[in-house]
């Protein structure tokens, strides 16, 4: 899986932080924005990780090798065209130039075969080019509503598809976001960005861009198409081949081009949260481009991305680190002061597992401080269950480090202790699952608990025990899947905790489908 998983946790934190800092200029697709009407009404809700006043037969594990639609594949060798990208006269050589030529050649060949099977019409190649933009390039980039596109324009958007001239431009500058992604995660990330922009070219040809849809809807489909192409690359079906690391890098890239936390994703230019974008990418990767074509009429569900109140906005959706349960009816509890009782009430009362015993969270500084003769694995990652004591031991130094990282936060810890509670639920249910299968069920069950704290139209799902006070903040689910990436197995064949792709997929199954999706 991604190279960031193959290094130490602190190196992962540093890498994700570095990428996040450079991701402020999230790619906005010019033509998509220009051809879409604004939508002011939204069903998204304002959320808070703080407590709110008292006033949902097969395991979810999915092998990330895409298998749903292998019929749409090119078996003939793909010719890599030397002019597939308009590099211009003064382009500095990049290590990934040949890879991108192969990517664009492969995308053209793939859509030449795939588009007619989905839409019943022949594929029309781009009327314009795929342009590399860089500071040294002469002023020869076509405009999108203007006579010319400047390099400063491209830097703002990172990459875009323009329907007016039917062309794509990407930032090839040495100091741009794409160069940073390639340096940190590999050139596959730029290939996925170009596959996303090709997705908008598909929408231009299929008439989707004429429907005045919310931007987030068309972005979701483009993410899905990018995932479908990445699945093709992972199957080694074309001119580009992806490794586990490349696929994992794609997941991280989707996280890094999410909407800012607190932004209504239905606002003009909205692309969706990291959880939304990763989910669309995975849907395409696993199920293929036909699945993506249906997302316009039947979009994937979106998680809310707006703050609940000014206080939540001020703390950026992060509850204070600590264990104090606060005062009844007053929103002053610390993180574990409301997460622990919420987990116990969910499993013991709302789910009502027979024989459930509430768990206690005990913070310790090192594993030697855990007085348990049957401590389960997980302490190194942050939390581990002691079944004989009905106790979850929290690795407080690791937990505090995660909490303080800019790209993680409070719900990284909610996810980690949620896994321990999910394991206790499997024990109480008498589950006989083992190994990776069992761990992925824990991911799914944790997602099912998370589903119960996501408001729908500003109301938490019912029925629920009235003493439960947890509710997610925008960005919380992104923090959870970031954490899944750093604790997951390095490759798909390790089969211990599940690869990052598998863990995120299982977690998402629980969030979307509830406990019934987990097969526990």
Language-model features: locations:
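Catalytic zinc-binding patch centered on the HExxH motif and its immediate surroundings
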Residues: 135-169, 365-393
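Short pre-active-site segment immediately N-terminal to the catalytic Zn-binding motif
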Residues: 174-192, 210-214, 396-415, 430-437
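Pan-zinc metallopeptidase signature
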Residues: 73-75, 260-350, 489-520
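C-terminal motif of bacterial Sec signal peptides marking the signal peptidase cleavage site
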Residues: 22-25
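Short helix/loop segments within enzyme catalytic domains
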Residues: 115-116, 217-219, 223-260, 337, ...
């Amino acid at each position: 899986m991604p190279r960031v998983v193959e290094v130490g946790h602190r190196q992962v934190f540093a890498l994700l932080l570095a990428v996040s800092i450079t991701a402020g200029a999230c790619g906005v697709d010019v033509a998509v924005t220009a051809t879409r009407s604004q939508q002011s009404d939204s069903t998204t809700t304002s959320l808070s990780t703080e407590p709110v006043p008292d006033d949902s037969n097969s395991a979810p594990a999915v092998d990330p090798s895409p298998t749903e639609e292998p019929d749409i594949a090119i078996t003939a060798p793909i010719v890599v065209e030397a002019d597939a990208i308009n590099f211009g006269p003064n382009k500095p050589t990049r290590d990934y130039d040949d890879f991108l030529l192969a990517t664009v050649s492969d995308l053209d060949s793939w859509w030449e075969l795939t588009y007619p099977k989905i839409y019943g019409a022949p594929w029309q190649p781009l009327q314009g080019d795929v342009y590399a933009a860089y500071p040294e390039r002469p002023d020869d980039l076509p405009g999108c509503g203007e006579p010319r596109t400047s390099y400063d324009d491209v830097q703002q958007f990172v990459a875009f598809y323009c329907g007016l001239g039917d062309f794509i431009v990407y930032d090839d500058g040495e100091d741009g976001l794409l160069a940073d992604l390639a340096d940190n995660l590999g050139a596959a990330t730029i290939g996925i960005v170009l596959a996303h922009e090709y997705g908008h070219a598909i929408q231009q040809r299929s008439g989707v861009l004429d429907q005045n849809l919310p931007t987030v809807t068309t972005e979701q489909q483009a993410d899905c198409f990018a995932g479908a192409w990445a699945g093709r690359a992972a199957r080694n079906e074309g001119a580009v081949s992806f490794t586990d690391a490349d696929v994992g890098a794609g997941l991280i890239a989707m996280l890094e081009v999410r909407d800012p936390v607190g932004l209504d994703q239905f606002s003009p230019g909205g692309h969706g949260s990291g959880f939304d974008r990763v989910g669309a990418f995975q849907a395409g990767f696993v199920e293929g481009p036909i699945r993506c074509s249906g997302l316009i009429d039947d979009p994937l569900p979106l998680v809310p991305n707006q703050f609940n109140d000014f206080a939540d906005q001020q703390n950026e959706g992060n509850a204070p680190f600590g264990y104090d349960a606060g005062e009844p009816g007053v929103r002053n509890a610390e993180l574990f002061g409301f997460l622990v009782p919420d987990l116990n009430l969910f499993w013991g009362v709302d789910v009502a597992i027979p024989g459930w015993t509430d768990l206690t969270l005990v913070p310790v500084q090192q594993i030697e401080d855990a007085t348990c003769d049957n401590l389960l694995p997980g302490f190194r990652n942050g939390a581990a269950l002691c079944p004989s004591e009905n106790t979850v031991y929290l690795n407080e130094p690791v937990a505090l480090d995660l909490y303080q990282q800019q790209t993680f936060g409070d719900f990284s810890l909610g996810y980690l202790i949620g896994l321990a509670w999910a394991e206790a639920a499997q024990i109480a249910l008498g589950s006989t699952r083992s190994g990776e299968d069992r761990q992925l069920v824990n991911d799914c069950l944790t997602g099912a608990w998370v589903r119960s704290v996501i408001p729908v139209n500003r109301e938490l799902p019912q029925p629920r025990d009235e003493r439960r006070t947890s509710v997610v903040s925008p960005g919380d689910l992104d923090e959870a899947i970031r954490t899944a990436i750093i604790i997951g197995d390095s490759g798909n064949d390790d089969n211990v905790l599940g690869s990052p792709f598998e863990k995120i997929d299982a977690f998402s199954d629980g969030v979307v489908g509830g406990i019934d999706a987990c097969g526990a």
